[in-house]
C-alpha cells in the first residue's frame, strides 16, 4: 500500500468518529472531555487494526455485531436526550458522561471498522504498525475536528443545535444498527 492509500484508508475509518463527534460537540462538552475523547479514539484506531490482525475473522464478526448494537443503543439514547432538551427548552442538557467507561464505549462504537480492516491487512504486504499509527492519528484529529465543529455550530444555532445534534446521533445509530 502506498502512503496515499494508507491515508485514504485512515480517513475512511475516521469518518464515523467525525460524524458522531459533530453531534456530541453540539452538547455541553468540556475542553478536557474533548481531549480525552479524541485521545481515546486515537488509541482505539491504533489498537483495533492490530487486534484485528491477530484475532481472526470469526471473533471479529461476533464482536462487531455486539459492539455495533451497543453503540447504536447508546447513540439512540444520547440523540433522544438532545432532541428532548432542544424541544422542551429545559434549563440544562443532561450531561453525557465522559468517564472511563463512557469514553471506552464511545471509542469502541466508532472503531469496530478498524478491527475489520485489521483482518484484511494480514493479506496485504504492509507494515501493520505504521498503518495502525497513521489510522490512529488521523482518527484522533477527525474526532477533535468533529467535536470542535459541533461546538461552533451549537454557538450559532443556540438551543436548536440540540435538536440537530440529536438527529445526527439518531441517523448514525440507525446506520450502525441496520448496517450490521
UniProtKB/Swiss-Prot annotation:
Keywords: Cell membrane, Ion transport, Manganese, Membrane, Transmembrane, Transmembrane helix, Transport. GO terms for cellular component: plasma membrane. Signal peptide: none annotated. InterPro entries: Mntp/YtaF, Put_MntP. It is found in: Cell membrane. Disulfide bonds: none annotated. GO terms for molecular function: manganese ion transmembrane transporter activity. The chain crosses the membrane at residues 6-26, 34-54, 63-83, 100-120, 128-148, 158-178. It comes from the Bacteria. Pfam families: Mntp. It is a multi-pass membrane protein. Its main location: membrane. Probably functions as a manganese efflux pump. Belongs to the MntP (TC 9.B.29) family. PANTHER family: MANGANESE EFFLUX PUMP MNTP-RELATED. This is Putative manganese efflux pump MntP. It comes from Carboxydothermus hydrogenoformans (strain ATCC BAA-161 / DSM 6008 / Z-2901).
Amino acid at each position: 500500500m502506498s502512503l496515499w492509500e494508507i491515508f485514504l484508508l485512515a480517513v475512511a475509518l475516521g469518518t464515523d468518529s467525525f460524524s458522531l463527534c459533530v453531534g456530541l460537540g453540539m452538547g455541553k462538552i468540556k475542553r478536557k472531555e474533548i481531549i480525552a475523547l479524541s485521545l481515546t479514539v486515537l488509541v482505539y484506531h491504533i489498537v483495533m487494526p492490530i487486534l484485528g490482525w491477530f484475532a481472526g475473522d470469526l471473533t471479529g464478526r461476533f464482536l462487531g455485531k455486539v459492539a455495533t448494537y451497543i453503540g447504536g443503543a447508546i447513540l439512540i439514547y444520547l440523540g433522544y436526550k438532545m432532541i428532548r432538551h432542544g424541544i422542551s427548552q429545559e434549563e440544562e442538557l443532561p450531561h453525557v458522561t465522559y468517564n472511563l467507561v463512557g469514553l471506552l464505549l464511545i471509542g469502541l462504537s466508532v472503531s469496530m471498522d478498524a478491527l475489520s480492516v485489521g483482518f484484511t491487512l494480514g493479506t496485504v504486504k504492509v507494515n501493520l504498525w505504521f498503518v495502525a499509527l497513521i489510522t490512529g492519528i488521523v482518527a484522533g484529529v477527525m474526532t477533535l475536528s468533529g467535536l470542535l465543529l459541533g461546538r461552533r455550530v451549537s454557538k450559532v444555532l443556540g438551543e436548536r443545535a440540540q435538536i440537530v445534534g440529536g438527529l445526527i446521533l439518531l441517523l448514525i445509530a440507525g446506520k450502525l444498527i441496520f448496517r450490521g
